[in-house]
């Protein structure tokens, strides 16, 4: 027997078997220790108050006593300031727990901060959704979903013509064999939208100030109701209509215009109710806060420039409805446009101010439907000018001339 054959048959050398190593076993994942019943009960017992009151110096035992009364963080956020004060008084009377002065202010400050945080989260979420919608519309390569953005803008000067020209250019590039046309078009559209939104935010931050509420906006081109800084469709223009007449075609009548002022009054009442519930400052006139609330409620057709533009026309409608109706009928018969009718509404108001000692502000404040509106600057200037003219004319005559006599002379044709 060959010893070499026996050895080679018994011990076979396999290099691959030596190189392969057994895989190391994977250690089982470490299981987290389950929360003890005491820990879970601790978090449920406080109801989120520890995170709400933590940075405001409220003691732990105070938060525990509030939680024992059945209050949670969500409950406190939805309460008014008067209700918070009642809760703290109940805490002192029931548990005989002495609240520190800083704790009382800290509880109110924590609730206000939580309200602001929730409101900011809602605004960020809505802006994020709006940005996603605009981005999706820009990537699709079509401007059909962006009718509001492609409409003509009074401030930026944009119109549909550049958009159509861009679409034609992109189509020509794609038909010419360039596959980057859609991508370039989408990037260009997104950049334009971002620039437009940035400019609108800057403009709104400059003009959206409640301190300048008394200023008139006569110099703005808002006959069609196009507000600056708002993404809305251009509305139908107004035409002169008689009382009870419905405008035909894509037009709006004057009855609809006066109805918008009644809606603004309702929105003001809603804003006042919300402000009282929150313990905030309650507006007494139609301010930017009311217009923002109207837009948030879906009434995009109500905007500050348009309502300030025709407020003196609405004032004439409230103070002397017969004169307003007669003026509307006369301009309707003559076929005058709404701009001429708007200018003609100043003179009757100046005459009304003359009968009340030229105090047009007192005339507005005395009327329940006009007291919520600011007096237009132009109307106040006309009253001041007419008053100076009347005083100068009275100084030249012996004994002077009264306002009633001046109106009688105007009626007879002696101007």
UniProtKB/Swiss-Prot annotation:
GO molecular function annotation: DNA binding
Name of the protein: Putative transcription factor BOFH
Gene Ontology cellular-component annotations: nucleus
Coiled-coil features, chain-numbered ranges: none
Bias (Gly residues): 174-183
Expression sites by tissue: Acts in the floral primordia.
Chain positions of site Interaction with DNA: 281, 288, 292, 339
High-level lineage: Eukaryota, Viridiplantae, Streptophyta, Embryophyta, Tracheophyta
Family per record: Belongs to the FLO/LFY family.
Transcription regulation as UniProt keyword: yes
Gene Ontology BP terms: regulation of DNA-templated transcription
Ranges of compositional bias, category Basic residues: 193-202
Region (Disordered): 159-221
Its job: Controls floral meristem identity. Is required very early in flower development and may act here as a transcription factor.
Domain of life from the UniProt record: Eukaryota
Organism listed in the record: Brassica oleracea var. botrytis (Cauliflower)
Biased segments, Acidic residues type: 206-220
Key words, A-Z: Activator, Developmental protein, DNA-binding, Nucleus, Transcription, Transcription regulation
Places the protein is found: Nucleus
Keyword DNA-binding on entry: yes
DNA-binding positions: 234-238, 303-310, 374-377
